[in-house]
């Protein structure tokens, strides 16, 4: 059974992701590093169980486990970079509460595929240290403070005193720290979905459910919505319209270029990024590179070619001069900084970037390899003047079909044809 997917080990708790897996991962990591390992988690009820198993595995290999408590993925990434250490984030990001995950970080970065494959092989055996060398468990209470101080230094110029902001923290890892930091910069906040109970993370809230926050938008208010582990965000503008990752990339790329922060005058997108964004960037003399879907592939391209900015429509945006990973809070501050400098409304900024209609359908299947079927390829070849992208989910039993083009009715019809075909093939 393959454990690592597109974003670490992730699945339904006690069906796929068990305490034994957490223990084995901790034991392997403890045998790979020679100092300490930092652990953080989001607000899922299963986080405590997985944390204790992970700690047992780490300490059984003779390494100290530093428990950071509830913390965002980007904050943990910063801690591991500052401490030159490894870390494990216990979170399933935007997935519902019955899911959880284990994401390994090394000096701020996610692991490359070959290291994950090595870890997975090593997890088949357990290696204990001698009893005198068992690691210690340390409650690391300074993680939030270290992250807060870092953000304050990076954005010391920022004044958000004119901003009225609804903040949806998704009952997740951002529920305390992000509002505190935004208030520090002067924004007037209305915080929602900030009472996690272990079972309500991402439940009809956060970046995957903007429809509920739209009801709170009145007057000059705007909203920012985070996911469960805080590595991404989207906005809702004054008109109640979504300001998603493509819009974020377009607007902030212009400012990064003006500030000489946009290395090689290039932005990294994915195959799902809207053609309207690409046109906007090229019209502003900014080059574009596309990668596979997933922030890990965006980051790989950025590191390989020394680019500063990359991201995807879902709100995973990487500002590599500020962070080693997607960071919802840094994204928020970059967008609000652009908003303040422009003197415009968020809606006005949004309208600068064309957005071709897109329809995405998620097809639940038993066999995710169905998308390679010849009949699917034949239908794709028959589609002219519209963009069709079909790919399996890395974390769910789902095939995703994206259709993009100028006519909404037409792309909806195309998407439905693929849905019906894949469903029919999955029955065979």
UniProtKB/Swiss-Prot annotation:
Q: How is it modified after translation?
A: Activated by phosphorylation.
Q: Which domain of life is it from?
A: Bacteria
Which sites are catalytic? 93 (phosphoserine intermediate)
Catalytic activity of the protein:
alpha-D-glucosamine 1-phosphate = D-glucosamine 6-phosphate
Sorted alphabetically, which keywords does the UniProt record give? Isomerase, Magnesium, Metal-binding, Phosphoprotein
Q: What is the cofactor note? A: Binds 1 Mg(2+) ion per subunit.
The record's listing under CDD domains reads:
GlmM
> Which Enzyme Commission number(s) are listed?
5.4.2.10
Q: Give the Phosphoserine positions (modified residues).
A: 93
> GO CC terms on record?
cytosol
Q: Name one GO biological process term.
A: peptidoglycan biosynthetic process
Q: Does the keyword field hold Nucleus?
A: no
The molecular function GO annotations come to: magnesium ion binding; phosphoglucosamine mutase activity; phosphomannomutase activity
The protein's required cofactor(s) are namely: Mg(2+)
InterPro entries in the record: A-D-PHexomutase_a/b/a-I, A-D-PHexomutase_a/b/a-I/II/III, A-D-PHexomutase_a/b/a-II, A-D-PHexomutase_a/b/a-III, A-D-PHexomutase_C, A-D-PHexomutase_C_sf, A-D-PHexomutase_CS, Alpha-D-phosphohexomutase_SF
Binding residues for Mg(2+):
93, 227, 229, 231
Q: Which HAMAP family match?
A: GlmM_B
Q: What family is this protein classified in?
A: Belongs to the phosphohexose mutase family.
What is the role of the protein in this entry? Catalyzes the conversion of glucosamine-6-phosphate to glucosamine-1-phosphate.
What this protein is called in its record is Phosphoglucosamine mutase
Q: Which source organism does the UniProt entry give?
A: Thermosipho melanesiensis (strain DSM 12029 / CIP 104789 / BI429)
Q: What is the lineage of its organism?
A: Bacteria, Thermotogati, Thermotogota, Thermotogae, Thermotogales
């Amino acid at each position: 059974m393959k454990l690592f997917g597109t974003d670490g080990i992730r699945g339904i708790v006690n069906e796929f992701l068990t305490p034994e897996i957490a223990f084995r991962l901790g034991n392997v990591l403890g045998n790979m590093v020679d100092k300490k390992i930092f652990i953080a988690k989001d607000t899922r009820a299963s986080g405590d169980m997985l944390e204790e198993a992970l700690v047992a595995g780490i300490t059984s290999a003779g390494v100290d486990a530093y428990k950071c408590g509830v913390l965002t993925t980007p904050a943990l990434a910063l801690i591991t970079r500052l401490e030159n250490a490894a870390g494990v984030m216990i979170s399933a990001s935007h997935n519902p509460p019955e899911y959880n995950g284990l994401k390994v970080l090394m000096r701020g970065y996610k692991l490359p595929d070959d290291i994950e494959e090595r870890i997975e092989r090593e997890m088949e055996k357990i290696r204990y240290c001698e009893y005198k060398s068992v690691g210690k468990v340390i409650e690391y209470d300074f993680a939030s403070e270290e992250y807060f101080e870092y953000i304050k230094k990076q954005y010391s110029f920022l004044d958000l005193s004119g901003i009225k902001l609804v903040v949806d923290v998704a009952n997740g890892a951002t529920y305390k720290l992000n509002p505190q930091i935004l208030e520090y910069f002067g924004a007037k906040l209305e915080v929602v979905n900030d009472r996690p109970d272990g079972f309500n993370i991402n439940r009809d809230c956060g970046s995957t459910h903007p429809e509920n926050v739209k009801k709170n938008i009145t007057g000059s208010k705007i909203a920012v919505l985070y996911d469960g582990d805080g590595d991404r965000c989207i906005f809702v503008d004054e008109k109640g319209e979504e300001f998603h990752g493509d819009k974020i990339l377009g607007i902030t790329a212009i400012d990064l270029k003006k500030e000489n922060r946009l290395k090689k005058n290039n932005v990294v997108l994915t195959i799902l990024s809207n053609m309207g964004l690409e046109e906007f960037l090229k019209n502003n003399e900014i080059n574009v590179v596309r990668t596979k879907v997933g922030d890990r592939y965006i980051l790989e391209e950025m590191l390989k070619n020394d680019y500063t900015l990359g991201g995807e429509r879902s709100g995973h945006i990487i500002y590599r001069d500020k962070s080693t990973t997607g960071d919802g809070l840094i994204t928020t501050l970059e967008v609000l900084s652009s908003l303040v400098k422009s003197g415009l409304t968020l809606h006005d900024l949004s309208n600068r970037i064309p957005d071709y209609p897109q329809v995405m359908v998620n097809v639940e299947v038993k066999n995710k390899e169905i998308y390679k079927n010849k009949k699917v390829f034949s239908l794709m070849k028959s589609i002219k003047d519209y963009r069709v992208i079909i790919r399996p989910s890395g974390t769910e039993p789902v095939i995703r079909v994206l259709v993009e083009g100028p006519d909404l009715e037409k792309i909806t019809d195309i998407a439905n044809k693929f849905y019906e075909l894949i469903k029919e093939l999955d029955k065979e």
